Amino acid sequence: MKTSALFVIFGLVLLFCNSFAAELKTTGRGCGGLMAGCDGKSTFCCSGYNCSPTWKWCVYARPGRR
């Protein structure tokens, strides 16, 4: 019983990871959303976000923020 439950959970996780990878591949976004990695040279943030110089990920653009 425990083994079959583990197989079901493992199968659901595998299905989720596969669908997430397929969705990421089809969107092919050239810019990063919230908390996406960026460096300001080769990877950029979408409009409404700025690349944090400290953490190197996209954060919400706020007035008065660099």
Curated annotation (Swiss-Prot):
GO terms for molecular function: ion channel inhibitor activity; toxin activity. GO terms for cellular component: extracellular region. Residues 1-21 form the signal peptide. Residues 22-29 form a propeptide. The modification Proline amide is found at P63. The keyword Repressor does not apply. Disulfide bonds join C31-C46, C38-C51, C45-C58. It is found in: Secreted. Keywords: Amidation, Disulfide bond, Ion channel impairing toxin, Knottin, Neurotoxin, Secreted, Signal, Toxin. PROSITE patterns: HWTX_1. Probable ion channel inhibitor. The presence of a 'disulfide through disulfide knot' structurally defines this protein as a knottin. Belongs to the neurotoxin 10 (Hwtx-1) family. 46 (Jztx-7/10/12) subfamily. This is U1-theraphotoxin-Cg1a 1.
